A protein has these predicted regions:
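Short amphipathic alpha-helix segments
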Residues: 33-53
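P-loop NTP-binding catalytic core
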Residues: 108-132, 137-138
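A short linear hydrophobic-aromatic micro-motif
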Residues: 54-58, 310-311
């Protein structure tokens, strides 16, 4: 990208950032790139950019982009466009997720380069690149590279399981491991699969189908059944991990919030030589009836052990429809309010019990008000 006013990239070309009443204007020339790749079909990505900087007017004419308005936001928008252009030149296909995530990243730390953070592809499968789309996802992927056991904890839509499976496929393709093992607890059946009708495949398929679907997206669908038949890829309920030692394997445990503490301990102690484990889950979606979550407990038990990393993803890492992130935030706030009310009720009950013990008079026998 060339700046027709000879302003250094990222600088405010006109106006005064220290004077909020002044206006700034930046002129950017896009060379060697189709504008539709930068701005999106029907300028959808341009619309996303404008939402990030409401005090900036964006005008596009040919391959020229003009940004005008608040000096601080003009500078930020210019930096964002430059980063997006670099991604396009690197061969990356842009979506609204990259635009939003890049703007958020630059807003938190100007020293970050979204084109570097989001530019590293894990896999290219069926013409589609699988890569981190947020800073949190990028840090999660880096943690998988540098630790033997990684816990990816966060709400739905943060890519924690999908990215873990992509890293597993990458490790297999690079011959870093000999097999992939994907597992999750069949909590809806209480792991008592023998009581369900049909063959073993019929019984476990509904619980493991999301993992099969992801595999078919990442690999040749004709190759997946062969790898499954050969045992190179294994997809099984958590109960089938008991009593095994898993060497030379990349193991992914999904829906770990629905493991009991005993199941979590059993799973983690299956780790063998030259193996890697990724455990994913959302501690706000525990489906266990009247039982503690192994994922919730393990964050306290293993928090200070070397070579074990806890990656915590948030609503900012949700890469589904933008509304999903707002839904996650709303439920998080609701749960926090409910927990606060529960705590207040417990405190009030404890206070009443103390008062009762001091007075020696049970509350049931206190005189009633008339």
């Amino acid at each position: 990208m060339a700046n027709s006013d000879s302003t250094a990239p990222g600088a405010i070309p006109e106006g005064d950032a220290g004077n909020p009443g002044s206006a700034a204007e930046a002129h950017l020339s896009v060379d060697g790139v189709q504008m539709v790749r930068l701005l999106g079909p029907q300028d959808r990505l341009l619309t996303t950019l404008e939402r990030q900087y409401p005090l900036v007017n964006v005008h596009v004419r040919g391959n020229e982009i003009t940004l005008a308005g608040d000096p601080t936001q003009v500078a930020a928008a210019q930096r964002l466009v430059e980063e997006l252009l670099q991604m396009v030149r690197n061969g990356q296909e842009l979506s609204a997720a990259e635009v939003t995530s890049s703007a958020r990243m630059l807003g938190s730390d100007l020293n970050l380069s979204p084109s570097d953070v989001l530019g590293q592809a894990i896999l290219t499968a069926r013409g589609k690149s699988i890569r981190p789309k947020t800073l949190g996802q990028s840090q999660y992927v880096d943690a998988i590279d540098h630790n033997t056991i990684v816990f990816g904890i966060g709400p739905a839509g943060t890519g924690k399981t999908y990215l873990a499976m992509a890293k597993a496929v990458q490790a297999l393709q690079r011959k870093e491991v000999n097999r992939i093992i994907l597992t999750r607890p069949a909590v809806e059946a209480g792991e008592r699969l023998g009581y369900l009708p049909g063959t073993l495949t019929d019984k476990i398929d509904p619980y493991l189908r999301p993992l099969y679907d992801a595999l078919n997206e990442m690999m040749d669908p004709e190759l997946v059944p062969k790898l499954l038949a050969a045992g190179t890829i294994e997809v099984a309920p958590l109960a089938y991990m008991r009593g095994r030692t898993l060497n030379d394997s990349f193991i992914v445990l999904d829906e770990a919030q629905n493991t009991t503490p005993e199941q979590m301990k059993m799973f983690l102690t299956r780790l063998g030589f030259n193996s890697k484990m990724v455990v994913t889950g959302d501690i706000t979606q525990i489906d266990l009836p009247n039982s503690a979550s192994g994922l919730r407990l393990v964050t306290r038990v293993l928090n200070d052990i070397d070579d074990i990393h806890f990656a915590r993803l948030t609503s900012e890492d949700v890469v589904r429809h933008s509304l999903v992130g707002r839904i996650v935030d709303a439920y998080t706030e609701y749960d926090a309010r409910q927990q606060a009310r529960h705590y207040e009720r417990e405190q009030a009950a404890e206070f009443a019990n103390r008062a009762e013990r001091r007075s020696g008079t049970p509350r049931d026998h206190l005189p009633k008000r008339r």
